[in-house]
Amino acid sequence: MQPSHINLYQRPATKNLFRYRNKVNGSKIMNILSVGECMAEFSPDARNGKFNLGFAGDTFNTAWYIANNHSDVNSAYFSKVGDDELSSQMLKFMSDNRVDTRYIKEIPDSTIGLYLITLANGERTFSYWRNNSAATFLGQNSIDVEIAMEKQDMVYFSGITLAILDSHSRKTLFSCLRMARDAGKKIAFDPNLRPKLWKDKKEMCDVIMAGANLSDIILPSFEDEATWFFDADPISTLKRYQNAGADTVVVKNAGKPISFFSQQGIGTVPIDPVGKLIDSTAAGDSFNSEVLVGLLRKISLTEAINNGAQLAKKVIMGQGALVKSNV
């Protein structure tokens, strides 16, 4: 699959498609768009040693938890897929789980990325095949991105979303996020630092902060921020992202208290002890889903954080990235 094979992208004159949204939105349904890559997952079955096919990916996991736990929220996903059977299976899986797929575009002669999970002494390791996957071209056409964002109340993306894109697609996404924010959409961002996806540390940190500059809500993980931005403590992380322009920052910190910044000030929320840890794969993604929905509903930030922590606690006591659980 090479970009030269794709002839889908004609670029009509760009206009701001977002500006009329607030004047016509009489619906009680809230709309959240998650942007990124969903991949095919092959995970081992401990009972027979065979591999099971599933679908997951950081921003998709969040979209899935929103769709499965909140009937009053339309959880849409924006990405690109191929025209093969595996892509079709993934789209069906999304639709079957109430994720709105109307904005996902198909690229001929392409396929989706995939990853393989292997287990050794209870530890999970991941092998990825995602270079030139269809999702890496999600920012090629600005009109596709604008249309996807037009009817949303909130747009959510991550550092992994940014990492898989080339510089042109990244600039397109940034431009569309800026227009959406100017039109009153809330922009939410999980930095989700994954150095293996980047050319080098400097590129990763520079692009992450560029994404933060466009965001209202930022949901970092302290362990990553301490490693790559050398933050001494969660308050340092809060202040750095506050200075980038966010009005809400929530710092996840494994099982330790969660720190937050909002217009009401800085605070912490203690976390209940976790029972038996089975699989922490989507702890942060599930947590994010409850915080984002809570902020859209305008409940208190501490209540939203508590809801997120309770869901994440259930998720890590289940198996896999997507765990059915009523919140």
Where are these regions (language model features)?
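Conserved N-terminal subdomain of the carbohydrate kinase-like
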Residues: N74-I160
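Conserved phosphate-binding/catalytic region of the ribokinase-like
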Residues: N25-L33, M179, A232-V327
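Active-site metal-binding loops of divalent metal-dependent hydrolases
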Residues: C38, I160, P191, S286
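Glycine/threonine-rich flexible loop motifs
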Residues: L162-R170, W198-K199, F229-F230
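Conserved phosphate/ATP/ADP-binding segment of small-molecule kinases
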Residues: A183, P195-I266
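Glycine-rich phosphate/adenosyl-contacting loop at the front of the ribokinase-like
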Residues: Y20-N97
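N-terminal amphipathic/basic-hydrophobic helices that include classical n-h-c signal peptides
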Residues: M1-I29
